[in-house]
Structures are given as C-alpha cells and as structure tokens.
C-alpha cells in the first residue's frame, strides 16, 4: 500500500496526523507518531526480533529516520507498557535526543530506566497513573487502566484541537484480574460519551471468537501439576509476566517448595516487581540458584526464561547441558507457561526435543491450561467498540489478517465502513473536521541492530548470510592454458556443510567429467569454466542434500 501512495501533503490547519513507524501490518516494533500544529507526540518505541530469514541481526527497530530532522519538535514519548515490542527501541531514540520526556506508569518507567542504564542514558521520566492526565505542549494525555500480561499497562487518550484519539496499547478485558485492576471500560465509555474521534485498537486476537480465558485460570493448573511432580519442577515464562510468576510462587509455597529465579531478565524484573510491591513473596521462600541446586528436588521450583527457544536463554542452555549451575535429569518436570510466537516454532520444538531426550517431562499449553493470552478476543473487542462508540477506527498491532478482522468487528458495531482506516507502516492518516482518511505515505523500512552497527542491512547482505548459513564449498581446479583440459583432480573443501570428509567425492568426479566435456567443446575461458563448475556442484548439492551452500570455484591455468 505505502509504495503506491504519494508523500502526504502539508497537514491541513488544525488537523491531526497519525503515522505508524512500526507495529501495523506486523506484530512488534510498535511506534506511532502524532502530529498537531507542528509538534509531535510519540506513543511507544519497541523492537521486533529477527526471523530466520534475517541472520546476524540482533534487533529490528522502527525507522527512526523519518523523525531525525524533527527531533526538536517531539514533546514527549508516552509508553503504554513495558514489553520489549513497546520499549526496546527507546535507547536508540534517546541517543538521537536524550532529553525527550518519557511518560509511563511506575512499573513501566522502572523497566525503561534499567534498559536505559545499560546504554548509559539518564532520561527525563514523567510518572503517571490511570485517571490522571499530563500536558505535553499541544497534546493533553489522559490515562486509563488496562489489563494485559504485565503490570502498569495504560491506554492513552490524546486530546487536541483536532479531536480526541484513544490508543488502547495492548489490551484485555479480564474480569478477574489477579491484581484487582481491570481494564477501565467505564472510564473509556465516559470518554465515548464526550466523543472519541479516532480509536486505535489492538488487533492481535481479533480472529479469535468469544472471550479470552482469565489469568486466574492458570493458577489451579500450575498447582495441580506441581503437586503431582515427584522431583524438581522448572517453569518457563515471560520475564515480565508478574501475575504468572506470582501464581507459580503461590503454588510452590503452598506445596512446601521454595523458588529460585533463573535468567538475567527474570532476576532483574522480579527484583523490581518485589521492590515496587507487585510481587509478594517472603525472603525465606526465595533461594539463589546455588542454594536451589543443593535442595532436594521435590522441594524446589525454578522459574526461568527461555519460552521461545532463544539460544542463550536459561532453558535452552539447560536443554543442551550448558548451564553452569543447573543440570537437568530424567524425572524433572518442565512447564512451558507461555504462548508460541510465530516464527519461533523450530527453536521451541528443538528445545522440547532436547528436554525429552534427557528424560524430562514437558508440559505445554497443548496439554494443560498453563498459559492464557494477554490480548482481547473478538468478544472483548466488541465490548470496547460498543463502549467507546468511536467516530473513526484505525486497527493497530497486527498483521493484515488481524487488521481486517478487527475492522470487521468495528463495522459490525455500527462504525461506517468509510470511517474505518486500514493503514500500514509509513501510511499517514489525517483527522480533519472529524473525519479520518489516508493522506499519503512516507518511506519507512527496517532499522537493524547488527552488533555495534545500527542502520540498513540490505537484502543483498541478508541473502548472502542466508547462503552462508547453509555452508561453504570451495572448488579448486587446475587446467591447461589454451586447451582447458584438467591437469589434475579437483580439490574441494567444505565448511559448515558436512563433517564427512568423503561427502564431496562424488561431485569431484562430476566436476572432472564436466571439465573434459568443456575441453571437448573448446571452452578455454577461465570465467566460463568457473561458472560451469559452480553449476555442476550446486546442482549436485541441491539434489543430494537439499542445501544451497555458498559455492566458490577457483580456476588455475598452467
């Protein structure tokens, strides 16, 4: 879509422009820029983790180049919650302008502060809470409690002269939240009474009918599984899911076990959660990892990171026998208390297989209710639309199928189809005279963090890395100058392809036959010989191993 649109014209006087630099037509790297009267307000600034087709990339950022020449116009960065796909890129934005005010709840600011400390940044923080407001230049922001899978989530209503925009962030309507803080649907409905001109709504689970299960349903399942375990229990979950960790701790303590946190982010986040009063556990019930290893197996529960098969996460290292403190044994119970993020299937199943090989019992959400989503299902989104009654809707936080499903829900509640705007990253949506419409698009791409380098990593570079990930085969042939006939056997070397030294012997014979055929056809040009050798080796490797390694032929004339 964005490639087909012209750049947006100057914003109409008094209008409001909304441009997502990430998070629309994808799930991750959420960042939305609001423009009014020449000033900017940013909501969220997150990262996307690379897929298998982006080797060597550490993180993917929103395209910050769009605002690099307008940094002085930014009034504030409002953060809806502290998940990585909403805060992970904040240090990279602050390196461009360190004094941008960062606005968020107590828990959100605590995690952002730790992240910025790792980058040696000391931002200006503005702490807010639900039922409060803050003024940032021409933008007045009003905050509403939101239930999700991390403490301190907020929806934000942005009041401007052009109208009111309500951004849900990540949202769920859990009616039995463990922290006693349900999504403030009454408050949002009162906002709807006053008039919501544009509603940016979470689309993640818009395809799921009905209502999402409550987080409170997970606790009894965890209690039952831990009670039935005869040995050690290891529960893997997201390091930010404080309510989940609280339920694990409650079950463990009730069953006479003590707990230990494993993984840097888990230790850090739970330390912050305890300090701020979100996680309640006695000191006597917590062990460090060394003490936990000395405990009888049936008296300890380890709470660890690694739910997505991340190679360096604690659970993955345990599965490979590489964790410096924990050695898994047959009889351990491993509970994966998380969802499977699309794209991570191979890594997660690989970890599960490794755990099963050791003899551990692995329980996932497929076998028992050990996880529930933090995003609203379709039935909950209908409640939101009927409560807010927006004039215009812009689905966010989802791929195209999620956005379209969310748009259909909005239409079913009476929002006119012409007032539902389906956009993607880079597309500008202008709110003028109470009507939202697409005005154009700016060019946005992906900003890659690749080691110490931040910027573009082109398709050609990623393509080369993908080829290298399949291995490397070097072929050296010596031919007589003038005739092209082989002067000796072909010499092949492989790296990252096969450990069998004889694996390439059949193709060496094929290369020699190809050289004889070329000489018979009077082909003597070294470049043409090299091309033929590459084709011969590539075809054989593809047919034999279903691999496409990098193939480098060298032709030496004598």
Swiss-Prot record:
EC assignment: 3.1.-.-
Sequence positions that bind substrate: 371-375
Domain of life: Bacteria
Protein residues bound to Zn(2+) 1: 81, 83, 148, 170
Broad enzyme group: hydrolase
SUPFAM superfamilies registered for this protein in UniProt: Metallo-hydrolase/oxidoreductase (SSF56281)
Bound cofactor: record note: Binds up to 2 Zn(2+) ions per subunit. It is not clear if Zn(2+) or Mg(2+) is physiologically important.
Xref: InterPro entries: Metallo-B-lactamas, RibonucZ/Hydroxyglut_hydro, RMMBL, RNase_J, RNase_J_2, RNase_J_b_CASP, RNase_J_bac, RNase_J_C
Keyword Hydrolase: yes
Cellular component, GO annotation: cytoplasm
Keywords assigned: Cytoplasm, Endonuclease, Exonuclease, Hydrolase, Metal-binding, Nuclease, RNA-binding, rRNA processing, Zinc
Transmembrane segments: none
Disruption phenotype: Non-essential, it can be deleted. No effect on processing of furA-katG operon mRNA or of pre-5S rRNA processing. Complete loss of mature 23S rRNA. Minor effects on pre-16S rRNA processing. A double rnj-rne depletion mutant indicates this enzyme plays a role in degradation of previously processed pre-16S rRNAs and a decrease in mature 5S rRNA.
Cofactor or coenzyme needed: Zn(2+)
GO molecular function ontology, one term from the record: RNA endonuclease activity
Subcellular location: Cytoplasm
Pfam family, one: RMMBL
GO biological process, one term: rRNA processing
Sequence positions that bind Zn(2+) 2: 85-86, 170, 397
Task of the protein: An RNase that has endonuclease and 5'-3' exonuclease activity. The 5'-exonuclease activity acts on 5'-monophosphate but not 5'-triphosphate ends. Endonuclease activity can cleave within 4 nucleotides of the 5'-end of a triphosphorylated RNA. Plays the major role in pre-23S rRNA maturation, and a minor role in processing of pre-5S and pre-16S rRNA.
HAMAP family the record matches: RNase_J_bact
Assembly notes: Homodimer.
Family: Belongs to the metallo-beta-lactamase superfamily. RNA-metabolizing metallo-beta-lactamase-like family. Bacterial RNase J subfamily.
UniProt-recorded name of the protein: Ribonuclease J
Organism: Mycolicibacterium smegmatis (strain ATCC 700084 / mc(2)155)
